[in-house]
């Protein structure tokens, strides 16, 4: 976003804003992860590289949204607050297209729709409870950050995942 010559509007849930803007440390950027990324550098360069990297992840949030809010883009996009993967994680339902964008709340693995990845989800119990919200929508297509598009028995699969 920082290298784009276009204005990119950053929209997030209020619970996520302080992480995006850098007021709170990112939950997944633990020292051991940073060490894995920058461990090959000499000690005097490592801290500088880590600081520059963490600074590069920060962005100003232009607008905060709440659960159930409908954005005017694409014929209406409903915000679905789905904490668990992060405290302010959201999904988006494109009303006109019956398409659910789940971010990291769901994944597609080997063509199958599966739940959140426990390795990258700090609050698995909350993440699983959040899946129930997806069953309230008339979904024909699911788009996941990891794994891409899932179509087929979407409604049935969402109900199965919500039940655990």
Positions of PLM-derived features:
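Acidic/His-rich, metal-assisted hydrolase cores and their charged scaffolds
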Residues: 163-164
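Metallo-beta-lactamase
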Residues: 53-56, 60, 70, 76-83, ...
């Amino acid at each position: 976003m920082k290298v784009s010559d276009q204005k990119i509007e950053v929209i997030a849930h209020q619970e996520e804003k302080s992480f995006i803007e850098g007021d709170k440390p990112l939950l997944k950027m633990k020292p051991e992860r940073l060490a894995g990324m920058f461990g090959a550098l000499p000690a005097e360069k490592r801290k500088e590289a880590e600081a520059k990297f963490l600074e590069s992840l920060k962005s100003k949030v232009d607008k905060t949204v709440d659960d159930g809010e409908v954005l005017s883009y694409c014929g209406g996009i409903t915000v679905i607050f789905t904490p668990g993967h992060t405290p302010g994680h959201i999904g988006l339902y494109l009303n006109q297209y019956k398409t659910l964008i789940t971010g990291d709340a769901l994944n597609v693995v080997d063509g199958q729709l599966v739940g959140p990845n426990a390795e990258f989800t700090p609050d698995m119990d909350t993440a699983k409870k959040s899946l129930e919200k997806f069953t309230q929508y008339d979904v024909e297509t699911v788009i996941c950050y990891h794994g891409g598009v899932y179509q087929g028995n979407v409604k049935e699969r969402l109900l199965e995942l919500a039940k655990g």
